């Protein structure tokens, strides 16, 4: 499970680069039950709250040619050290380590297969507050064309532990990842081997996908459709996991809705 007790390599933030920030807020607000506030000193950025706790952010998409996408951030005590580890492991630095005064230190990267991710050292007011509950991040998932290579990279950078488990129906293997030295209940994501043809949502490039917890996957999926998004897969039940739907927002950013099995 994802918690707010951040340890090295655990998810601690996520944000969306959107071509139209107000339109994105108008979509995600009803779908996930979020409310939005502009933090002081920012230009066009909105913080999302779920039941009074910070659930992430939405900011302007400024990179020419880039697609709208969610970016996961993983905790690090030292963004500079992690940036060096990324380079040694074959990744690239997209955004050099920098400080956001009063909030956090961060850096953004691309792994060797092209998936984008970031790291964060939160300040006292930084990081996610809404996790594993309605409207909160409850899982992170990487679709990779070389799952073994991806795991080797992230284990080098973060020291993640991993465990393979059969996919439902015996169709392939799903790899669960957990921060270094943490028990199995601190698992925070998975890596799935896919072919290039299965990466249409991310224009053929491996990518990370956020999974948001919702009280009713079916009702949330209806809200996605009502507000101009697309339900690509589902809702469908994954035995032992919950009810899930893969969706895209009106700008094409993909995400997953899940009502966990209790």
Describe each PLM feature range.
Residues 1-7, 11-19, 46-47, 61-85, 91-138, 142, 163-184, ...:
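Vicinal oxygen chelate
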Residues 2-53, 88, 96-104, 142-186, ...:
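Core segments of cupin and vicinal oxygen chelate
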Residues 24-26, 58, 82-84, 150, ...:
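Short acidic, gly/pro-rich beta-turn/loop elements at beta-sheet edges
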Residues 33-35, 56, 76-77, 93, ...:
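Short, low-complexity, polar/charged sequence segments that are solvent-exposed and flexible
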Residues 40-132:
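Active-site-adjacent scaffolding segments
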Residues 196:
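Carbohydrate-binding/catalytic loop surfaces
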